[in-house]
A protein has these predicted regions:
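Extracellular beta-sheet/turn segments enriched in Thr/Pro/Gly and aliphatic residues
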Residues: 20, 92-132
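Short, ordered, surface-exposed loop/turn motifs in non-cytosolic proteins
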Residues: 26, 35-49, 132-134
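Short Pro-Gly-centered beta-turn/loop motif in secreted/extracellular proteins
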Residues: 64-74, 80
Length: 164
């Protein structure tokens, strides 16, 4: 009888700690930098389409998070003395895709002092209030499409242009 109870106890423990196969997520590894290097003491805010908000405080520039599939999430990268950067994620993926490719994200924040020193700072600030990137899964390339790189290049060109 003791053996049966012990067996049932272990069986229950294994089922309690095992992960449900239906739960899939996108693993995002990111590094947050500015013009001078990696940033520390960051706030990363996850804002979900249903209004749920999760806030992460991290001391290091490198961090990872997991977002469940079939979610639409806005990530905000916040650091004192820098303009907040927003990146939107659409984690809709085909059901037949069992192994999700992870995603590496490099986020470059702009210093508030730099933004305040340019001529068109109001226009730049308005532009920065919108998501600077949209990441979604591309079934044709079977990888994540990242428009954030093009937005960052455009912002950097506008900043350089204002100094000429």
């Amino acid at each position: 009888m003791r053996l049966l109870i012990l067996f049932l106890f272990f069986l229950n423990c294994f089922s309690f700690f095992s992960q449900d196969e239906d739960i899939r997520h996108l693993h995002i590894h990111f590094k947050v930098t500015n013009a001078f290097g990696e940033l520390t003491n960051l706030i990363i805010r996850e804002i979900y389409e249903d209004g749920a908000i999760d806030t992460i405080y991290t001391e290091k520039a490198n961090h990872s998070i997991d977002i469940d599939v079939n979610e639409h999430v806005l990530l905000e990268f916040i650091c004192k003395g820098h303009v907040t950067k927003r990146v939107a994620f659409n984690t809709d993926v085909p059901d037949e895709l069992k192994v999700l490719p992870f995603f590496d994200l490099v986020v470059e924040l702009i210093e508030e002092d730099l933004l305040n020193s340019i001529e068109n700072k109001e226009e730049m600030q308005t532009l920065m209030d919108f998501p600077m990137g949209y990441i979604k899964y591309s079934t044709s390339s079977r990888d994540w499409y990242n428009s954030q790189l093009e937005f960052t290049k455009t912002i950097n060109k506008l900043i350089k242009k204002s100094f000429k």
